[in-house]
């Protein structure tokens, strides 16, 4: 795992994805829908506002915990200790993506976090056949 980005190896992601799909009593379809949406996004970059709209939620606050749940499940499965923010909240999303605040004038006035899917997670999704590999021209 890269200390700078918390990106894991392709094999670790594959193991974590299998764990997610085998886990009982969770909505596998929802979490795969989230990962597929992120994978298919331009530059594999999304905001939580975009994810919320895709999932049919009113705003980003409903999408945040679902996105974080994927990371928390990965962390639990692989025994990862996660960095925390200033409030002491674990940054589970960092196992899925790196984030930046981007001036997002086209979508929202002000600044919004943009999440870039980790390349190794993208590769793991492809290798497991969970997404169709993107074609490059």
PLM feature segments, named:
Residues 2, 6-24:
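Short, Lys/Arg-enriched N-terminal segment that forms or immediately precedes the first helix
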Residues 76-89:
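Short Lys/Arg-enriched helix C-cap and helix-to-coil transition segments
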Residues 45-50:
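Short acidic, hydrophobic short linear motifs in intrinsically disordered regions
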Residues 30-37:
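Short alpha-helical "packing" element that flanks the helix-turn-helix/winged-helix DNA-binding module
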Residues 87-137:
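Phospho-regulated, low-complexity intrinsically disordered regions of nuclear gene-regulatory
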Residues 63-77:
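DNA major-groove recognition helices of helix-turn-helix
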Residues 39-43:
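Short helix-capping/hinge SLiMs at alpha-helix to coil transitions
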Residues 56-62:
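Short, basic interhelical loop/turn and adjoining N-cap
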């Amino acid at each position: 795992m890269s200390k700078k980005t918390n990106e894991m190896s392709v094999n670790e992601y594959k193991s974590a994805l299998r764990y997610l799909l085998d886990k009982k009593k969770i909505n596998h379809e929802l979490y795969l829908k989230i990962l597929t949406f992120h994978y298919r996004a331009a530059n594999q970059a999304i905001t939580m506002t975009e994810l919320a709209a895709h999932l049919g939620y009113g705003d980003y606050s409903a999408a945040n915990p679902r996105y974080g749940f994927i990371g928390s499940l990965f962390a639990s499965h692989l025994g990862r200790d996660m960095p925390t923010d200033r409030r002491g909240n674990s940054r589970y999303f960092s196992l899925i993506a790196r984030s930046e605040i981007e001036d997002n004038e086209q979508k929202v006035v002000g600044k919004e976090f943009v999440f870039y899917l980790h390349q190794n997670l993208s590769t793991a999704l492809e290798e497991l056949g969970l997404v169709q590999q993107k074609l490059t021209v």
